[in-house]
Design a protein with these regions (language model features):
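Conserved catalytic or regulatory cores that recognize and/or transform ribose-phosphate-containing ligands
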Residues: 1-105
Length: 105
């Protein structure tokens, strides 16, 4: 099952954000889930925000669920992804309620 990882990216320290998203993706793989990481969508930081959100939405629509990282509400893109998931009836999981990474990782 594919699950889309959604969270704040714009305006963050990209090195730290990449580590966070990668850790979540690794944990998902460990439990048999296929993660879809928007930081690995083939676009670069030089592409426009509009190009990123268009690709992210296309990728989201190929998934069975969305996993919202803490702080997602602070991200325009993550709020759009959440809205779409809500409107199409996609299951939504929240890191705050269903952490996928243990404190030891």
């Amino acid at each position: 099952m594919k699950i889309y990882i959604s969270g704040k990216i714009s305006g963050t320290n990209l090195t730290e954000t990449r580590k966070c998203f990668a850790a979540v993706a690794k944990a998902m793989k460990r439990i048999g889930v296929e993660p879809v990481n928007p930081l690995e969508n083939g676009l670069t930081e030089h592409d426009t925000w509009e190009a990123h959100i268009a690709k992210d939405i296309a990728d989201l629509l190929q998934c069975k669920a969305i996993y919202m990282l803490q702080g997602w509400q602070e991200s325009k893109g993550a709020r759009i992804e959440h809205y779409i998931a809500t409107e199409i009836g996609m299951p939504i999981m929240y890191e705050i309620e269903q952490p996928i990474i243990s404190e030891n990782e």
